[in-house]
């Protein structure tokens, strides 16, 4: 049994809605959502936005394109799945990747249906999902389920306030915890109890902060929150470190620096997430 107790998070994609690479997003990143989490020798991935392609490239170069991991989806809006067909390890039939989604109950398609009949299906995409199915299993679960992945890894799930549904995650390992709370919209006048439960006493929380409070009224009902709400959750839940996430495509590096400065003046343990950054938990 390994003595490795590493617990770390890497941001492979921090942007929301649509990838926006270019000279104005070099610092905070232009790829859409993808998290890589290491718990000892185990690897967990959350979401498959465009950032997952770079993760796959690393696995291909360093691990002979073999992957044994659990991949959890917060939901299946395009910015959270669009990188999946470009994730190289899935095309290795020796890989063992367990895909999980908890937001599709009662909807027309299950996870495999979305991937096989909508995402990886001509004329939208020329490579059929059959080419990844040998490496993958597909698990639709009811949001609220608790996963015991073994090796001391517990993953708790909770419903988020987002169109078509979404699930947040709390990863617990070696006495520490990480909360992933995106995509979600706050409730005006009260804090979201589901989010508070996921974030309770977390060592690290990642929270949907697409907008500022000033911008939010124009986007009410779109399923996203603000950095000001992130700080309220962090304070109420006694979160140790908070990363603002799902950066709006219109927020270039200059604007993100302004937000970072405003946030730091209020809470020194909170700041915007940066693509490529690794965080020890």
Residue ranges and their predicted role:
Residues 1-179, 190, 195, 256-281:
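Binuclear metal-dependent hydrolase catalytic cores
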Residues 177, 185-275:
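Cap/insert and terminal regions of metallo-dependent hydrolase folds
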Residues 182:
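Cofactor-binding loops of NAD(P)H-dependent oxidoreductases
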